[in-house]
Amino acid sequence: HGLLNISADDFFDIDTTMPEDKVEQEKIGRLLKKLDTLITLHQRKYDKLVNIKKSMLDKMFPKNGASVPEIRFKGFTDLWEQRKLGEVFEEYSEKNHAELPPLTIIQGGGTIRRDESERALQYDKSSLSNYKMVNKDDFIVHLRSFEGGLEKASSQGIISPAYHTFHGEDADSRFYYAYFRSKKFINKDLKPHVYGIRDGRSIDIEGMKTIRIPWASYPEQKSIGDFLTHLDTLITLHQREHIKPILEVKRVK
């Protein structure tokens, strides 16, 4: 009762609605128990998929200066390289595209159109010509990238001029998205290029471009990107088709 911030007497005086028939009470209790068991079962499967992805990510990128990853798809034997981020990805800044939809960056969720956002975001529509264009699957360095890594555009649109946009000609965005959001990249590679304190922190973009990142042949990047996309789809489907519906049923009951 301490968590509720009310006295024990007041807590036990709360009126509750329940059937008078004990048989009905027991049936409802059994149903809720079954729902809890199902939720636990599917949550375990969901957690297992998430852990599989985490483990595979750890093994599909070379560690500690190694030139090959621990796990590879059949048919790939070339050594991986370490290249500067600025060599793999080119920064671009293209403005005067007010005809494109303004986008909002979602931490860990790509981008959405501002007019589709649940939050009523205010912005000066007269300044849209100063916004930067970003193409689908290109990377965005946004205001909180020092915490969650780089974000990837889900569609073409325009973003705040405070952001930086990058395109990789021979880079599979799904492959690098996983890397750019990894703890290793954020805490070890990116952190030395973050300056300022608290809410004033920013990324030194020129310094970030010097970070050495793994580079594999485009076909191998694509194979890894395909695999990670498949895993993400399984994880999302399991949550949407199994866990959420059961939680909704329990809430209604």
Task: Name every feature range the model reports, one short phrase each.
Residues 1-253:
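Feature detects amphipathic, helix-rich regulatory segments
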